Amino acid sequence: MSTSTRQLILQRCFEAIQAKGFETLRTDKEIARLKITKGAFYHYFPNKAELGYAVVDEVMLPYYEQKWASLANIEIGVAKALIAVLEQEKTKATETSIKRGDVLTNMILEMSHVDDIFRQKLEVVNEVQVKIIQKAIMSGRIAGELKNQTDARSMALYIVGQLMGCYTISKVRASKETFVSMVGTMQKQLKDVLVAETAASKVSDVTVNTVTSPSGDRPKSTIGVVNPFAKPEEKTEEKSTRGGWFSRNR
């Protein structure tokens, strides 16, 4: 029995998990589908749990590393590369993939509370993504492309979590359009939050449409997005002679 047989089992089972989840995975059906003997299957994986652990370690982990591969060891062009990854997520989305949802998110919700080994392995997959993005953000700060006040780890966690959330909301709505819209909003939001003023124009070619105000201010999103990281605008208010209030900034 060769290593290629083992890899084939893992890949086919990963695809089955993507489609219907881990709990519904039937090893007997996969054995029949692969046209291998039970002996060959159980030679590699003595039980379903061991199969699941191997799928996470050997298929899911590299799958998610590859998603963010363009950010690994990057030194310049971080914001543009990050926005491009999100653009790719929109491009490759299909009605079927959206209805299935994100396989990592699905498995976290399905298995992390019933099997702590699963939880730990799924956390590793999550953390690998966070570390790639975190390192890239730190490089962007050093290059002067990203704002210095950005907390790299918190922002990396936020990005991974936001994308997982986009998949989850779109899955429950069974709507590719919702996914594309949400990720587009995420792109605009990240540009506002992350990119230093001097580097803002360099990422405009991969972002969604924006409009510029008549006063010449920096581009504003056409969709009203609340920026959770922005400081509120300070206004100086004084009482008028009529007893009302007015703002000097009006």
Q: Where in this protein do the model-derived segments appear?
A:
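Helix-turn-helix
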Residues: 8, 16-58
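Hydrophobic alpha-helical connector segments
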Residues: 54, 68-100, 152-159
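Amphipathic C-terminal alpha-helical segment
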Residues: 92, 139, 159-177, 189-199
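Amphipathic alpha-helical segments used for helix-helix packing
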Residues: 95-117
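Long, low-complexity, intrinsically disordered segments
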Residues: 218-250
